[in-house]
């Protein structure tokens, strides 16, 4: 059986922004978007093939990914086997979501983005990172899980709303899903993942300048490599890549000791971490989320093989001290997605919230992981008490004293 793939507020408190509770059956009308063909590019079309009437947020889903900048949260892909929630017979990609959404922070509104080009079809447990104005997507699986995996890199420029497949050379990773990915020093690193049947401990690197893949061969003996895994997360400090959790269909790995890949020595190292007093260490988990702010890494939610977790932990990459934060997810989830803004606000969307009923949620929550700057506090209050700000023309915004950077966040 293939491995599953879908699966002014107070600080350190989750705030719900949008979304319907798991299992909501609100009827939605779906409208196909016409396909566009040209002689020069016969495959050109709008891949977000359905626009929804009366729905202001993405349907409940799991196995999707998200990234954030100062202005938007971008949510791509996902999976929901619930026939009605996924659009029924009018959704050609059921039970997957071949679509890209953005949540605009300034207005609190969701927008399904119409895009041109070649959107990937591997829509569950892919990897997604933000590089400038580009979304980079790698891997993932279609349906059935493990039978239609990907190993190409797709790029979507969010300004021009166009997808393209990156032409790469060299030794690409296998067709996998559930891998972890990060951009470090101009290289795209991919670690682990699964074919659906075989789990990986491979580490690959793509040079984003030359577009050449290589498989890194660490100097360790095979017995010293990390255990094969999927649905883990990675963090980095510029000198090492740190692997956090993950597992297989039958296990979840501990967070008491962390595997770290050393760039300089080309070796894997085992780094013990420090517990949070009597609270100890975070539970072993897979299918959790992870965001990083400088040298602090935050993990949230996940699944330990028995229960869905809703806790929030912080790891300092200089001291390797774990700290349990005094916040719990309002809807404990796994196979959810999370992203953090440059200002330090984390957004969490979707995920599986009930194992027995196989229910997913479409809820969106936010939580500040750092003390917001005075600018951010003033900005949030300005938007709260002057919501029509987004409707003003640029010259009026400039007259009000807004900087060009803040004006860009209104678009």
Swiss-Prot record:
Pathway(s) per entry: Protein modification; protein ubiquitination
Looking up Pfam families in the UniProt record yields: Kelch_4 (PF13418), Kelch_KLHDC2_KLHL20_DRC7 (PF24681)
The Kelch repeats extend over 72-133, 135-186, 187-239, 240-288, 296-342, 345-388
**Record flagged with keyword Repeat:** yes
* GO process annotations (BP): positive regulation of stress-activated MAPK cascade; protein ubiquitination; rescue of stalled ribosome
Q: Which UniProt keywords apply?
A: Kelch repeat, Repeat, Ubl conjugation pathway
User: Entry's SMART domains?
Assistant: Kelch (SM00612)
Q: What does this protein do?
A: Substrate-recognition component of a Cul2-RING (CRL2) E3 ubiquitin-protein ligase complex of the DesCEND (destruction via C-end degrons) pathway, which recognizes a C-degron located at the extreme C terminus of target proteins, leading to their ubiquitination and degradation. The C-degron recognized by the DesCEND pathway is usually a motif of less than ten residues and can be present in full-length proteins, truncated proteins or proteolytically cleaved forms.
Note the subunit structure.
Component of a CRL2 E3 ubiquitin-protein ligase complex, also named ECS (Elongin BC-CUL2/5-SOCS-box protein) complex, composed of CUL2, Elongin BC (ELOB and ELOC), RBX1 and substrate-specific adapter KLHDC10.
Family listed: Belongs to the KLHDC10 family.
Q: What is this protein called?
A: Kelch domain-containing protein 10
Underlying gene: klhdc10
């Amino acid at each position: 059986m293939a491995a599953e793939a879908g699966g002014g507020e107070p600080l350190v408190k989750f705030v719900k922004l949008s979304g319907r509770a798991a299992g909501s059956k609100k009827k939605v009308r779906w409208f196909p978007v016409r396909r566009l063909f040209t002689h020069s590019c016969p495959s050109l079309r709008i891949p977000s093939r359905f626009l929804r009437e009366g729905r202001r947020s993405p349907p409940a889903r799991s196995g999707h990914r998200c990234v954030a900048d100062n202005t938007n949260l971008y949510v791509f892909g996902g999976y929901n086997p619930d026939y009605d929630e996924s659009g029924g017979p009018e959704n050609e990609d059921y039970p997957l979501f071949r679509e890209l959404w953005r949540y605009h922070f300034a207005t609190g509104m969701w927008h399904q983005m119409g895009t041109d080009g070649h959107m990937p079809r591997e829509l569950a447990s892919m990897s997604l990172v933000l590089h400038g104005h580009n979304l980079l997507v790698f891997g993932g699986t279609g349906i059935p899980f493990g039978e239609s995996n990907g190993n190409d890199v797709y790029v979507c420029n969010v300004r021009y709303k166009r997808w393209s497949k990156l032409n790469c050379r060299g030794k690409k990773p296998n067709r996998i899903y559930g891998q972890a990915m990060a951009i470090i020093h101009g290289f795209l690193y991919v670690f682990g993942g699964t074919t659906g049947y075989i789990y990986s401990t491979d580490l690959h690197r793509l040079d984003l300048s030359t577009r050449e893949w290589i498989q890194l061969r660490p100097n360790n003996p095979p017995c010293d490599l990390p255990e094969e895994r999927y649905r883990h997360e990675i963090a980095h400090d510029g000198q090492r890549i740190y692997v956090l959790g993950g597992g297989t269909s039958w296990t979840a790995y501990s967070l008491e000791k962390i595997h770290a890949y050393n760039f300089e020595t080309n070796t894997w190292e085992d780094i013990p971490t420090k517990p949070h007093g009597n609270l100890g260490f975070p539970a072993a988990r897979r299918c959790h989320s992870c965001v990083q702010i400088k040298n602090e890494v935050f993990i949230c939610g996940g699944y330990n093989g028995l229960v869905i977790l809703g806790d929030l932990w912080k790891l300092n990459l200089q001291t390797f001290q774990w700290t349990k934060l005094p916040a719990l997810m309002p809807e404990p989830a796994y196979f959810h997605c999370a992203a953090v803004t440059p200002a330090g606000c984390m957004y969490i969307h979707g995920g599986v919230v009930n194992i027995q009923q196989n229910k997913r949620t479409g809820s969106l929550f936010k939580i500040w992981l750092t003390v917001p700057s005075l600018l951010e506090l003033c900005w949030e209050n300005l938007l709260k008490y002057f919501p029509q700000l987004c409707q003003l023309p640029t010259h009026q915004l400039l007259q009000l004293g807004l900087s060009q950077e803040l004006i860009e966040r209104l678009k």
